[in-house]
C-alpha cells in the first residue's frame, strides 16, 4: 500500500519500522513541529522525523491540520491509507476520508478501555495486569472508531509506563502490518466498540503525581509506576519537594504507627511509610529538592532521624 504516516514520538517509530519491513510505500511522514526541549530549550525534532530523514522519506510538519492545507497536500500524494500513531492532533473529516482505506490508528490499549491521550500511563497507574494494542478505523470521535484487530499484552509487576511503552509499540507495529494485510484481502470485519465499557485516559497533569498517603500502598505504588517518567511521584518533606523514585508495597507489619505519611527507617531496606488501610510502602530511592537522587536510607542518615512525616 501507499501509506501517508502521521505520528510524532518514539512510540510511533516501531510502526514505521514495521511498515518499512513489510514493504509498504511510505509517501510521507507527518509529524508535529520541532519543539524546544531540555534545559537549554533548543529545538528538538520528533523521533519520526529523524527516522524519515535518515531514509529519505518526505516530512511534513504543519502547524495546523484543520484548515484544509494538509488534506490537500496528502490528497496529491494519492495514499491508499493514512496510518496514525500518537500524532497528537485531532483530525477532521477531510483527512479521515481522503484515502480509499481511510485512516487507520495504532492505539496503546484494548479499546474501549483507555480512550484518550495517555492509555499506557493510566493502565499501569490503575493497577491493571493486562493491556494491549488496538488497530482501529478512525472516525471523528475520541478513539471511538471500529476495531479492526487487537493484541493483548501482560503488564508485569515491575513495569512502569516507560518500560511498557516499547513492548506495546513493537506489538502495535506487528498488529498494524497484519491488519493492513487483512484489509487489502477484504478479510477484516470491523467491530463496533461497546461505549458502555469505555474509560478515559485523560492527559496527565503535574499534580497527578502528588502522593496521597491515605491511599493503600498498592495504589500508591501503581501510580508511581504509571507516572514514571512523568509527572513522577512526589510528596513534601518539611516544605521541600521529595520525589519518590523507587518504592514497592511492604509488609503491613512494617507500617509505622500514626497517621498516613509517617515514615520510619527499616534498617538495611529503606523507609516504611504508613499508607491507607494500615498498609506500608517501602521507599528505597528518593530525590529531595535541590539534591541529587539518593537512597532513602542515605536521606534519613543525612537528616539524622529515624522517623519523620511526609506530606508536610
From Swiss-Prot:
Keyword Transferase listed: yes
PROSITE patterns associated with the record: GART
An example Gene Ontology CC term for this record: cytosol
Keyword terms: Protein biosynthesis, Transferase
Listed EC numbers: 2.1.2.9
Reaction catalysed by this enzyme: L-methionyl-tRNA(fMet) + (6R)-10-formyltetrahydrofolate = N-formyl-L-methionyl-tRNA(fMet) + (6S)-5,6,7,8-tetrahydrofolate + H(+)
Domain of life of the native organism: Bacteria
Binding annotation for (6S)-5,6,7,8-tetrahydrofolate: 109-112
SUPFAM superfamilies linked to this entry: FMT C-terminal domain-like (SSF50486), Formyltransferase (SSF53328)
Main EC class the enzyme belongs to: transferase
Bilayer-spanning residue ranges: none
Pfam family, one: Formyl_trans_C
Any GO MF annotation of the entry: methionyl-tRNA formyltransferase activity
Keyword Transferase: yes
Cross-referenced NCBIfam families: fmt
Family: Belongs to the Fmt family.
UniProt cross-references to HAMAP family, sorted A to Z: Formyl_trans (MF_00182)
Function summary: Attaches a formyl group to the free amino group of methionyl-tRNA(fMet). The formyl group appears to play a dual role in the initiator identity of N-formylmethionyl-tRNA by promoting its recognition by IF2 and preventing the misappropriation of this tRNA by the elongation apparatus.
Protein name: Methionyl-tRNA formyltransferase
Source organism: Anaeromyxobacter sp. (strain K)
Taxonomic path: Bacteria, Pseudomonadati, Myxococcota, Myxococcia, Myxococcales
Amino acid at each position: 500500500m501507499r501509506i501517508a504516516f502521521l505520528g510524532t514520538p518514539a512510540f510511533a517509530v516501531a510502526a514505521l519500522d514495521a511498515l518499512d519491513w513489510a514493504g509498504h510505500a511510505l509517501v510521507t511522514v507527518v509529524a508535529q513541529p520541532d519543539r524546544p526541549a531540555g534545559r537549554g530549550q533548543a529545538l528538538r525534532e520528533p523521533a519520526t522525523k529523524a527516522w524519515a530523514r535518515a531514509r529519505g522519506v518526505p516530512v511534513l510538519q504543519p502547524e495546523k491540520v484543520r484548515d484544509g492545507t494538509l488534506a490537500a497536500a496528502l490528497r496529491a500524494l494519492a495514499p491508499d491509507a493514512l496510518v496514525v500513531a500518537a500524532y497528537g492532533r485531532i483530525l477532521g473529516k477531510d483527512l479521515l476520508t481522503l484515502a480509499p482505506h481511510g485512516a487507520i490508528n495504532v492505539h496503546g490499549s484494548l479499546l474501549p478501555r483507555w480512550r484518550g491521550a495517555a492509555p499506557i500511563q493510566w493502565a499501569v497507574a490503575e493497577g491493571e495486569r493486562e493491556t494491549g494494542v488496538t488497530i482501529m478505523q478512525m472516525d471523528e470521535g475520541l478513539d471511538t472508531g471500529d476495531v479492526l484487530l487487537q493484541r493483548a499484552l501482560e503488564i508485569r509487576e515491575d513495569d512502569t509506563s516507560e518500560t511498557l511503552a516499547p513492548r506495546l509499540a513493537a506489538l502495535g507495529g506487528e498488529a498494524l502490518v497484519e491488519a493492513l494485510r487483512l484489509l487489502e484481502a477484504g478479510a477484516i470485519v470491523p467491530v463496533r466498540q461497546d461505549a458502555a465499557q469505555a474509560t478515559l485516559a485523560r492527559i496527565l497533569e503535574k499534580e497527578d503525581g502528588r502522593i496521597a498517603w491515605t491511599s493503600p500502598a498498592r495504589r500508591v505504588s501503581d501510580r508511581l509506576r504509571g507516572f514514571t517518567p512523568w509527572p513522577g511521584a512526589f510528596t513534601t518533606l518539611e516544605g521541600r519537594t521529595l520525589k519518590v523514585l523507587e518504592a514497592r508495597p511492604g509488609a503491613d507489619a512494617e507500617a509505622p504507627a500514626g497517621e498516613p505519611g509517617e515514615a520510619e527507617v527499616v534498617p538495611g531496606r529503606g523507609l516504611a511509610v504508613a499508607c491507607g488501610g494500615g498498609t506500608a510502602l517501602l521507599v528505597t530511592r528518593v530525590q529531595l529538592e535541590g539534591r541529587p537522587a539518593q537512597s532513602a536510607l542515605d536521606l534519613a542518615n543525612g537528616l539524622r532521624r529515624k522517623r519523620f512525616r511526609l506530606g508536610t
